[in-house]
Design a protein with these regions (language model features):
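Cys-nucleophile CN-hydrolase/nitrilase-fold catalytic domain and related Cys-dependent amidase chemistry
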Residues: 34, 43-126, 190-217
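A short, polar/charged loop-to-alpha-helix boundary motif
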Residues: 131-144, 254-269
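Short beta->alpha transition motifs characteristic of CBS
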Residues: 64, 71, 118, 129-135, ...
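Short beta-strand scaffold segments in enzyme catalytic cores
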Residues: 103-105, 116-119, 150, 237-239, ...
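Active-site catalytic loop in hydrolytic enzyme cores
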Residues: 3-9, 79-82, 108-207
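N-terminal active-site segment of His-dependent metallophosphoesterases
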Residues: 2-55, 185
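CN hydrolase (nitrilase-like) catalytic-core segments centered on the catalytic cysteine
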Residues: 82-100, 168-257
Length: 269
């Protein structure tokens, strides 16, 4: 269950003094092909696990892609949580590799749709977060998140989640930090902003590093590559340390996995 204690009353918790290997899985996503994307994610998760990853982050909507024609189409790709196939896939992978995994998907609850990040671990489903700041056509198809910004206690530390545009607002990071999160896992689809001067392609890495520094917290952001109608994705996945510096990345515009060994107890120093 999420921890939502006031800042002044955080109880003592288990501290992991050993580094946790964090992996951001940067992959292409085939639009509207869930079977292919799950198979591909499985291969990437296996690779990350073979390199000792204990916490893995997948991109935003990693099973479906992002651009749709209308709400009816979005609804046809939505799943329930935790019963749906995508969540159960992540549960299976977490148990198989004794790892924690974060990934974003389209969630259905009744007639409402959400952009939802899932956290699974070695013991199964842990919790979910629903995107607060909807972007582009999402505002016509999905509901803003209604779960707040939970922080989940795990054996490796306190984990929080954000999704894409959430990471462009400093308040979201601050809410994670005030609840004593050790690491924020961001599933995102950073798109190429043509107005930025070279060599910059997106504001994502800069904002990630700035908010890691200002909140003395680890931030791991996994984005994607490839293109969809009207959008192209330049990569740039990054893991930032408590001093704001990049521990890994920004990643190039190719399928890859970046790794960083993060001593999550550094957030308490």
């Amino acid at each position: 269950m999420p921890d939502q204690y006031p800042y002044s009353s955080i109880p003592p918790i288990y501290r992991n003094e050993n580094p946790v290997r964090v992996a951001c899985i940067q992959t292409d996503v085939k639009l509207k092909d869930i079977n292919f994307n799950i198979k591909h994610a499985k291969q990437m998760i296996e690779e990350a696990a073979s390199h000792g990853a204990e916490l893995m982050i997948l991109p935003e909507l990693f099973t479906t892609g992002y651009t749709f024609q209308n709400r009816k189409e979005v609804y046809s790709y939505a799943e329930t949580v935790p019963e749906g196939a995508t969540c159960q896939f992540l549960v299976e992978q977490s148990k198989l590799y004794s790892a924690y995994i974060v990934g974003s998907m389209i969630e259905r609850e009744g007639d409402d749709l959400y952009n939802c990040s899932i956290l699974t671990g070695p013991d199964g489903f842990i919790g979910k977060y629903r995107k607060l700041h909807l972007c582009g056509d999402e505002i016509y198809w999905m509901e803003p998140g209604n779960l707040g910004i939970p922080v989940f206690r795990t054996k490796i530390g306190r984990i929080s989640m954000l999704i894409c545009l959430d990471g462009f607002y400093p308040e979201t990071y601050r809410l994670c930090a005030l609840q004593k999160a050790d690491i924020i896992c961001v599933s995102t689809n950073w798109s190429h902003v043509k107005a930025l001067p070279a060599p910059y392609k997106t504001m994502g890495p800069t904002l990630t590093m700035a908010n890691a520094l200002s909140n003395h917290i680890f931030v791991a952001a996994a984005t994607r590559i490839g293109a969809e109608p009207g959008l192209d994705y330049p990569g740039q996945s990054i893991i930032a340390g408590v001093n704001g510096g990049p521990l890994a990345g920004p990643a190039p515009d190719t399928e890859t996995i970046i790794y960083a060994d993060c001593n999550l107890s550094d957030t308490r120093k």
